[in-house]
C-alpha cells in the first residue's frame, strides 16, 4: 500500500497539471460512470491528501480516493484507456488514470470532513500556523502523542494506526524505530517525551524527503552504498533502507542478522542489537 508521501505527490501532481482547468472526467470501466458524468467539464480546483486519502476537488463536487493495496493513479500522455480504468481525469494532452482503488466515491463537504475526522495527524501537513487545517492537524498531533503515552500497545503497532498517525506505513515505522534505536515491541506508555518527540521529528523529516524525492531513503550519509562500498539495494520499493525487507541480512550498522515478525498485520523488521532501547 502506498505510504502518505506518495499520495501527497499525487495531490500535487493533479493540482499542478489540472488545477484551474476544465477537465474531462470519465469512467472507461463504467463503475464510476454516473458520478463522472456529474463532474465532466467542470473545473478541477485542487487536490489534497490527508494521510493515505486523496481528495480531488472540482467545482461540481469532490472525489474521495483511497488506493488500498493494489490501486494506482498514473499520469500518461493522452491515449486510449488501457486496462480497468475506474476514473480518468484528462485535458487535451495528459490523462490521469485511476485503477484498482479501494475507494473512489463522490462525496459532499460533510462527508469529506467526516472522513478526515477519523484520521490522525499527518506528518506531511502543516501543524498549526493559524489556518483551520493547520490547527486541526495540531490538535490531532496532541491527541496522537497523548494516546501513545497512555497505550500498552507496542510502539510499532501504534505508528501504523491511521487514526493516530495518518500516512505512516510499514516502511517508515520500521525505519524510524531503527534510526532511533527503539525496540518496536516497547509499549507506547514506556516512551519518554523526548523519545516521542524524536519519533515525530524523524518521521516528518523522512516523509518530507520522500515526498520531494519520490522514493524512500532512510540511511544516513555514512551508510550509503558509496560510503560503505556495498551494492545499491535492489527492491520494488526502491531507496536505501536499514532493515525493511532485509530479514536475515547483516545490519548495516553492527552486522547482526536482521530479524522479522508481524505487527499490526504487517511485517516488521529490526536489529536485536541496535534496537535495545
Feature map (PLM): residue ranges:
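Basic, nucleic-acid-binding surfaces and adjacent catalytic neighborhoods in DNA/RNA-processing proteins
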Residues: 22-35, 48, 144-277
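Intrinsic-disorder/low-complexity coil detector
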Residues: 1, 27, 76, 80, ...
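Gly/Gly-Pro- and Ser/Thr-rich, intrinsically disordered tail segments characteristic of DNA damage-repair
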Residues: 1-109
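Non-transmembrane, interaction-prone segments in cytosolic or luminal domains
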Residues: 8, 16-20, 32, 39, ...
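Phosphate/anion-contacting hairpin/loop surfaces
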Residues: 63-179, 187, 199
Amino acid at each position: 500500500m502506498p505510504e502518505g508521501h506518495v499520495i501527497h505527490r499525487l495531490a500535487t501532481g493533479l493540482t499542478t497539471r489540472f488545477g484551474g482547468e476544465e477537465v474531462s472526467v470519465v469512467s472507461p470501466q463504467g463503475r464510476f460512470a454516473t458520478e463522472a458524468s456529474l463532474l465532466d467539464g467542470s473545473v478541477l480546483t485542487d487536490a489534497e491528501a490527508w494521510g493515505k486519502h486523496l481528495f480531488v476537488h472540482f467545482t461540481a463536487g469532490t472525489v474521495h480516493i483511497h488506493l488500498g493495496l493494489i490501486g494506482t493513479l498514473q499520469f500518461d500522455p493522452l491515449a486510449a484507456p488501457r486496462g480497468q480504468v475506474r476514473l480518468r481525469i484528462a485535458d487535451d494532452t495528459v490523462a490521469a488514470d485511476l485503477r484498482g482503488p479501494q475507494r473512489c466515491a463522490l462525496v459532499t463537504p460533510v462527508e469529506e470532513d467526516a472522513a478526515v475526522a477519523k484520521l490522525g495527524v499527518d506528518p506531511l501537513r502543516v501543524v498549526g500556523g493559524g489556518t483551520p487545517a493547520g490547527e486541526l492537524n495540531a490538535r490531532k498531533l496532541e491527541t496522537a502523542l497523548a494516546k501513545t503515552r497512555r497505550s500498552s500497545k507496542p510502539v510499532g503497532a501504534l505508528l501504523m494506526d491511521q487514526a493516530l498517525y495518518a500516512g505512516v506505513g510499514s516502511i517508515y515505522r520500521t525505519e524510524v524505530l531503527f534510526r532511533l534505536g527503539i525496540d518496536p515491541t516497547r509499549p507506547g506508555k514506556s516512551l519518554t517525551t523526548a523519545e516521542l518527540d524524536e519519533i515525530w521529528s524523524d518521521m516528518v523529516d523522512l516523509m518530507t524527503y520522500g515526498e520531494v524525492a519520490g522514493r524512500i531513503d532512510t540511511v544516513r550519509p555514512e551508510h550509503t552504498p558509496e560510503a560503505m562500498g556495498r551494492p545499491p539495494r535492489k527492491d520494488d520499493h526502491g531507496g536505501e533502507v536499514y532493515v525493511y525487507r532485509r530479514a536475515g541480512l547483516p545490519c548495516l550498522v553492527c552486522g547482526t542478522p536482521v530479524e522479522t515478525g508481524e505487527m499490526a498485520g504487517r511485517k516488521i523488521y529490526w536489529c536485536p542489537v541496535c534496537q535495545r532501547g
